[in-house]
């Protein structure tokens, strides 16, 4: 089932007509993390259902998305909210705090209070914590009594009879901590006696309305979509749109994504960008970009399923709830000294570099052309080199311009361009035209420039 899920994800990533929605969904999957490296290791249809939900809400409202995630049975299993029970001291039962902690730290507000531009608020020389252990306990009590759709008081302990990942979790009132007063964030208090459904809505509202959410979400989405080191002004402009889309709506993700992609900082010409602008491409995104650029896999054919081996990254397969990498990771050396972050470099190591280079060569140099496949035989991986050969024969620089456009977004510098054209001028003495195309492609896809998005 794992390979089927990867194949389905690949089909959408390579051939889906809603590429922006899918990119945003992938970014959200690294914020609202679940993973098959957990109790969900054999629940691949259920993980796929969760991902479909992220895509459905990618341009919707963040409050609705937060509720979808909270009541998702996949998330319930992953962070132990499903089956979470009210206190019972006689039986040593206390509400599980896992989801309560992560919904604050990782999904909405972070650890410390933020200004609109994402900078820390400081008091007496120290950051101001957003919550304490009492807050965690209060939310943990709110998140009790929820189980698989169809569960009742009588079937609570027989969870296998109710196993249902297609529908959102439901409240079983007898297991909810209704008799406990809960002091939440933003001055919200759930009084004792409040029913579990109402308590849940109050808790999610208290998180959604917190002033940290705008800059917290803005930074994450900017880092996944545009640049690792956005300026404070870029974050502030995006957070302001989160707070109000111009029509009085808070949390409009469609407006937020539009702001991120059309912001003046994102649209600057390469020559005008600050030196620190841009990001390392996630390994998985880099591989998908190359496959898409050359149509290596046709629609509705078998797709690659070995992402972890090649990229150190697979969809919804992070090693923990903290994602594949930290948004604040900085490698030792010059970037660290400059106070810059490069999150994606946390999963790029020597082994990955060798495997990535090998697979760049495999895809660009050793993938057969459609003309090389004998009639009557099927091969999932092929490239039709005809248009590329035509460009090469017309002018090698024309082919290189195309590779520059689709792989480097027009960012190839003169030194790289001259080196590739000089090599081709010599290599054409012993290489066929199709071999020249393959070698030029590998020189681009194997380059450091291809690893960077600017």
Question: Where do the PLM segments sit?
Answer:
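Short secondary-structure transition/capping motifs
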Residues: 13-17, 39, 43, 92
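Active-site substrate-binding loop specific to GH73 endo-beta-N-acetylglucosaminidase modules
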Residues: 1-9, 43-303, 451-454
């Amino acid at each position: 089932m794992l390979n089927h899920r990867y194949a389905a994800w690949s089909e959408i990533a390579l051939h889906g007509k809603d590429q922006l929605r899918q990119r945003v969904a992938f970014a959200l999957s690294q914020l609202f993390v679940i993973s098959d490296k957990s109790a969900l290791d054999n629940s691949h249809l259920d993980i796929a259902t969760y991902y479909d939900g992220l895509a459905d809400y990618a341009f919707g409202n963040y409050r609705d998305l937060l509720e979808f995630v909270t009541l998702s049975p996949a998330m319930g299993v992953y962070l132990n909210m499903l089956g979470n029970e009210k206190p019972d001291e006689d039986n040593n039962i206390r509400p599980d705090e896992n989801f309560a902690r992560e919904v604050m730290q990782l999904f909405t507000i972070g650890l410390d209070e933020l200004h609109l531009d994402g900078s820390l608020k400081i008091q007496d020389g120290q950051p101001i914590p957003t919550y304490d252990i009492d807050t965690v306990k209060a939310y943990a009590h709110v998140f009790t009594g929820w189980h698989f759709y169809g569960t009742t008081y009588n079937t609570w302990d027989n969870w296998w009879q109710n196993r249902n990942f297609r529908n959102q979790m439901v409240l079983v009132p007898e297991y909810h901590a209704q008799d406990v007063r809960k002091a939440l964030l933003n001055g919200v208090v759930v009084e004792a006696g409040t029913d579990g459904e109402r308590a849940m809505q109050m808790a999610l509202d208290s998180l959604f309305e917190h002033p940290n959410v705008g800059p917290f979400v803005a930074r994450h989405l900017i880092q996944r979509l545009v640049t690792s080191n956005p300026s404070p002004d870029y974050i502030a402009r995006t957070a302001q749109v989160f707070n109000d889309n111009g029509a009085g709506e808070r949390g409009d993700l469609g407006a937020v994504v539009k702001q991120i992609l059309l912001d003046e900082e994102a649209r600057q010409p390469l020559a005008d960008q600050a030196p620190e602008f841009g990001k390392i491409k996630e390994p998985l995104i880099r591989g998908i970009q190359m496959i898409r650029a050359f149509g290596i896999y046709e629609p509705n054919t078998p797709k690659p399923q070995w992402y972890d081996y090649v990229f150190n990254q697979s969809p919804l397969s992070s090693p923990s709830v903290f994602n594949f990498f930290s948004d604040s990771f900085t490698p030792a050396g010059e970037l660290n000294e400059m106070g810059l972050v490069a999150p994606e470099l946390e999963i790029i190591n020597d082994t990955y570099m060798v495997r990535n280079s090998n697979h760049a060569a495999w895809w660009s140099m050793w993938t057969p052309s459609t003309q090389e496949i004998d009639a009557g035989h099927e091969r999932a991986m092929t490239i039709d080199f005809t248009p590329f050969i035509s460009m090469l024969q017309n002018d090698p620089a024309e082919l290189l311009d195309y590779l520059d456009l689709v792989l480097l977004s027009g960012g190839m510098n003169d030194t790289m361009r001259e080196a590739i054209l000089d090599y081709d001028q010599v290599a054409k003495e012993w290489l066929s035209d199709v071999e020249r195309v393959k070698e030029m492609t590998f020189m681009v896809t194997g380059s450091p420039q291809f690893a960077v998005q600017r």
